[in-house]
A protein has these predicted regions:
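Acidic/His metal-coordination segments adjacent to aromatic residues that form catalytic metal sites
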Residues: 2-5, 41, 86-100, 136-144
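Short, contiguous alpha-helical
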Residues: 34-85, 128-171
C-alpha cells in the first residue's frame, strides 16, 4: 500500500486522484448513468454512490467520536461481513440525485476530508490508536483509513469508469 511522508503529500494525492476520477464523469449522460456494461461491476451511478457512502462514513465516524458518541464501524446497521447490504444502502441513499448533484456532493466531501486532514497533527494522522473508530485488530493509523476510502478507490474506480465508457463506445 502506498505511504505518505506527511499530510501535505496525502492531501496532494487525494486532490490529484479525485480530479482524475471526477473528470471521468464528463460525457456520461444522465440517462446512461444506470447502464451496466459487460465486464464492469458497477454502473456510473453505483460507482459514485459507493464513493459518497464511504467518504460520508469516514467523516461521520470522526464527527461522532469528537462528539463523544460511540462509533460502530462500518455502521450500526451493517457489519463488515455484510458489505453488500451496505453498498445497496449507498445506492438507495443517492438514487434520487442526478449525476451532477452527486459530483457536487463528492467534491464537498473531499473538501471536508482535506480540511479535516489539515486540522490533524502528525501523531493523530500517522500513529495507530489515535482514534477509537480506527482502532481495529489491524491497528491502522487514521491516514490509512483515509487512503482506502479516497485515493485507492479513486484510482480503481476511475479505471472502471474508463472501461465502462470503452464498452459503451464513448471513449
Amino acid at each position: 500500500m502506498q505511504t505518505y511522508k506527511d499530510k501535505a503529500e496525502l492531501i496532494e494525492e487525494i486532490k490529484k486522484r479525485y480530479l482524475l476520477y471526477d473528470q471521468e464523469f464528463n460525457g456520461i449522460k444522465e440517462d446512461e448513468k444506470d447502464l451496466l456494461q459487460p465486464g464492469v461491476d458497477k454502473t456510473p451511478s453505483q460507482n459514485i454512490s459507493y464513493q459518497l457512502g464511504w467518504t460520508h462514513l469516514l467523516l461521520q465516524w470522526e464527527a461522532d467520536e469528537q462528539k463523544g458518541i460511540g462509533v460502530k464501524t462500518p455502521t450500526p446497521e451493517y457489519k463488515w461481513n455484510n458489505l453488500g447490504g451496505l453498498y445497496q444502502s449507498f445506492y438507495n441513499e443517492y438514487r434520487s440525485h442526478s449525476l451532477q448533484q452527486r459530483r457536487e456532493l463528492l467534491r464537498n466531501q473531499v473538501d471536508e476530508i482535506i480540511n479535516w486532514i489539515e486540522s490533524l497533527d502528525d501523531e493523530t494522522l500517522f500513529t495507530p490508536g489515535q482514534r477509537k473508530w480506527a482502532t481495529t485488530p489491524a491497528q491502522w493509523p487514521v491516514w490509512k483509513w483515509i487512503h482506502i476510502n479516497t485515493v485507492a478507490p479513486f484510482k480503481n474506480f476511475r479505471t472502471q469508469l474508463r472501461k465502462w465508457k470503452k464498452e459503451k463506445g464513448t471513449e
